[in-house]
Design a protein with these regions (language model features):
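Acidic, proline/glycine-enriched N-terminal capping motif
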Residues: 1-56, 60-63
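Residues forming anionic-ligand binding surfaces in small-molecule and nucleic-acid pockets
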Residues: 7-10, 17, 62-72, 143-158
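Short amphipathic alpha-helices in soluble, non-transmembrane regions
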Residues: 37, 89-94, 126-127, 172-181, ...
Length: 328
């Protein structure tokens, strides 16, 4: 078990997300400009709320998974580091068609995140008692830390992100580490997050979603507003609802050691899918996997064969986290 895993599941870890893309879209048509790019409907949510959604190409394939934060003055869009250039191009092209302007603030801002069951208490110690009132997908301009404070996350644990100007980096890091000292807060490794996400069936685009996959296949249909019209990939995604081909499915082995070699998923010696990620879950004490299998077989409790081992399809999240089990 890695130190980061233990911290996130039992205490809290501090992560530096500064390499992620951060855009601020402003102007009279800021909502229109962003809405033309994403598959959810930004007009359907109030200010000070966030969306977790996808940007698609015309074939319906996922190009980026993004957070979209709606403020009174404009729209924040956050993305993975390797999607920065692509998203910048899409946002700028959309903004040029209306009265909106895209500010790429990635190089001028930074982001620190506290993740774990103790993260809310740490955020309250650093940013004030009112932080307890921030709901999931909520955020505020926090005066005490001079940051945009967001409650987001994929791990099933509390996650509070602090976005600030670059010059605040050292001070903010010190404030958070001091606030978290009594809770055992330590620096976490971003590379350990995909496993923590997978246990909740939150998907890392880099680790869990092959290029060309659409949201129906990935099980991310909840990131799409199927009542919305006129976004890239609309027709293709609707067509995939009836014929997804293969769909993502969580598998659980009874073994501790992950299977090696061939990751093909089989039933009765017939190839029906493939694992894209296999890992050991310290909390379960078992090996888990994410596989894309023929849609007709993508059902909980079906037992597959992977490298000669039984792999049972299971529902997710795979367990109740300490955050979910604690009084909110």
């Amino acid at each position: 078990m890695s130190t980061t895993y233990q911290l996130v599941r039992n205490q809290a870890a501090l992560f530096d997300f500064s390499s992620e893309g951060r855009f601020f879209i402003k102007g009279t048509d800021a909502i229109e400009a962003v809405n033309a790019v994403i598959a959810s409907d930004l007009e359907a949510i109030p200010e000070l709320k966030a969306l977790n959604t996808v940007v698609l190409d015309e074939s319906g394939a996922i190009q980026a998974i993004v957070w979209v934060l709606k403020t009174e003055d404009g729209i924040w869009v956050l993305c993975d580091p390797d999607r920065h250039t692509l998203l910048a191009e899409r946002l700028v092209a959309s903004a040029m068609k209306c009265s909106a302007e895209v500010d790429d603030l990635t190089e001028f801002t930074m982001c620190l995140a506290v993740i774990g069951p103790a993260a809310q208490k740490i955020a309250m110690a650093a940013a004030g008692e009112d932080v307890i009132g921030i709901p999931y997908l909520g955020f505020e301009a926090n005066e005490q830390t001079d940051t945009l404070l967001c409650r987001l996350g994929y791990t099933g644990e509390f996650e509070f992100r602090f976005i600030a100007a670059n010059e605040r980096a050292s001070d903010l890091r010190a404030i958070l580490l001091e606030a978290g000292a009594e809770y055992g807060l330590e620096i976490g490794e971003v590379s350990d997050l995909p496993l923590l996400m997978l246990e909740m069936r939150s998907l890392s685009q880099r680790e869990h979603i092959p290029e060309g996959t659409n949201p129906i296949q990935a099980g991310l249909h909840w990131m799409v507003d199927f009542q919305k019209e006129n976004y890239p990939g609309h027709d293709a995604v609707h067509a995939r609802k009836a014929d997804p081909g293969r769909k993502a499915l969580m598998l659980q082995f009874e073994t501790v050691t992950p299977p090696v070699g061939d990751q093909t998923v089989r039933i009765d010696q017939q190839d029906v899918g493939r694992c894209v990620c296999v890992a050991f879950s310290p909390t379960l004490g078992k090996t888990i996997a994410l596989a894309y299998v023929d849609a007709a077989l993508a059902w909980v409790s079906v037992v597959f064969d992977v490298a000669g081992l039984d792999a049972r399809a299971v529902s997710a999240p795979l367990f109740i986290t300490k955050t979910a089990a604690s009084p909110q």
